[in-house]
Amino acid sequence: MYLQTLHLRNFRNYQHQHVDFSAQKTILIGNNAQGKSNLLEAVELLASLKTHRTSRDADLVKQGEATARIQAQIQRGYGTVDFDLLLRNQGGRTLKLNGEILRRQLDGLGTLNAVEFSCLDLDLVRGGPDCRRQWIDNLLIQLEPVYARILQEYQQVLKQRNALLRTAKKLHRNQAAIPTDLTQQLTLWDLQLAATGSRVTRRRSRGLLRLMPLAQAWHRDISSQTETLEITYCPNIPWQQDDPHHVQQACLDKIEQRRQAEQHQGSSMVGPHRDEIEFSINGTPARFYGSQGQQRTLVLALKLAELQLIETIIGEPPLLLLDDVLAELDPSRQNQLLDTIQTRFQTLITTTHLNSFGADWLKHSQILTVNQGTLQPYARPLSETYGP
């Protein structure tokens, strides 16, 4: 898997920019707020059709423009793919693969696989449960693009069910009886929540089971065999057997237990939208007691495990996007990460300086300067020599 070219038009602070990626490793160097992260965000959009920085396409369109466009040529094991994504300021997208408009944009998922690692990923450990749910969901979409539809179906069911529960809450507040038709509607949506929720929770469990031994091995290596990582999936629906009927029944049983509380609160209190994932180091919860260094080691191990798992399942190494992350790692962890990458993964790295990179890395990298949304080849000082 190789991103050969990228063309941006009116995307963020880029007006018109074309990039030919001429090396396995590309370093984007520049001061803050020049557009380094914006370029990585464009690649993230190609991989996941969303960005961790905003949920509004209007934020992605250059100020004063009506549309933005991202075009890319991607080399896969099965051939070359032309990817064309048009974003509109007023909403609505058009996605083309090899010139053909996709009726369902989710069909574009899986064309490009990428793992992003930024300073914001420390929230994986110290942030709330929603950060960890979003993390595992994003990984599962990379591994199995159909999971995006499964997740979308669940969220639609959740939205409809919550609307009914809000109606029930108003009736409770007014001390009015809940009409039979509302009770019947809720029963139907209970069944839908159990059916769609079981698909989400079972896939999350299986994904974490596959990821955990890889993350544990990386964590032991990075910590010089001094620490043991444990990842525990804590589903909101307690289930013991990986069987759809068993999980659905477990969900319905818990809904029945929490029915009065849900109607009083006006929202769904049962389902995978309330799942938690816990990380512990040597038996101690990393979220509350892990040092900053331990938390960074944990996230680094998770990212390396993601790369390994995606490569194993997809059969091709994904892209790696490193957004100003080297500054967050000490020299030992920097070396661990850079040594692992080498030429195995196509890598795009943003940085404000080149001090973290060895001579061999710089010699075999494409280095681009980013300045106010414009890319230029890095002008190496005459004193810089990276060998013959």
Swiss-Prot record:
One MF annotation (Gene Ontology) recorded for this entry: single-stranded DNA binding
Record GO biological process: DNA replication; DNA synthesis involved in DNA repair; double-strand break repair; SOS response
Principal location listed in the UniProt entry: cytoplasm
Residues binding ATP: G30, N31, N32, A33, Q34, G35, K36, S37
Keyword set, alphabetical order: ATP-binding, Cytoplasm, DNA damage, DNA repair, DNA replication, DNA-binding, Nucleotide-binding, SOS response
Location of the protein in the cell: Cytoplasm
Gene Ontology CC entries for this record: cytoplasm
SUPFAM superfamilies: P-loop containing nucleoside triphosphate hydrolases
Origin: domain of life: Bacteria
Record-linked InterPro entries: DNA-binding_RecF (IPR001238), DNA-binding_RecF_CS (IPR018078), P-loop_NTPase (IPR027417), RecF/RecN/SMC_N (IPR003395), RecF_2 (IPR042174)
HAMAP family cross-referenced by the UniProt entry: RecF (MF_00365)
Job description of the protein: The RecF protein is involved in DNA metabolism; it is required for DNA replication and normal SOS inducibility. RecF binds preferentially to single-stranded, linear DNA. It also seems to bind ATP.
PANTHER family: DNA REPLICATION AND REPAIR PROTEIN RECF
Protein name, UniProt field: DNA replication and repair protein RecF
